[in-house]
């Protein structure tokens, strides 16, 4: 595993390389955010952004979505993966928001994961982006990049999240989440990483091996 002082240098370089790194899902409030994140599972943010404008125009509030027929909702999101399941989930989510939380998205982790269709990653994104809480949400990009370059060495998403929280200062958690996502999308591709133009290649275990990195 990379030493902590080098981890700090890696994070600095990633922040310099991706100063624009932020949540790529278009939203105007926390309700729209949680719906968009729930829809983004196994789907690109770009695809979600193509369907949410019409969806949010038709169902602008939790109350409106809670009263919707899932089949009608599905028609708005059929261009994304698992749209039938997701339409049922976001309607059920809205119903629970209205019945249990006064129509407001809660800012508590346990409350969030009690909502249909909301897992650990979605809850962490909402808490970080929507409420400004320090969180590291581990998606496929964060998992791949963090383990590939040697920030952590873990086999699953939860262990990766906990290990990153241990290695990275809390005040950098949210920023690191976005930087790793942008690096995974733009440079550290799953199949063909662009190591020749990578801003952190001198530190990367994938490039240099665990004994020679840095």
Language model features by range: what are they?
Residues 2-213:
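Catalytic cores of DNA base-excision repair glycosylases
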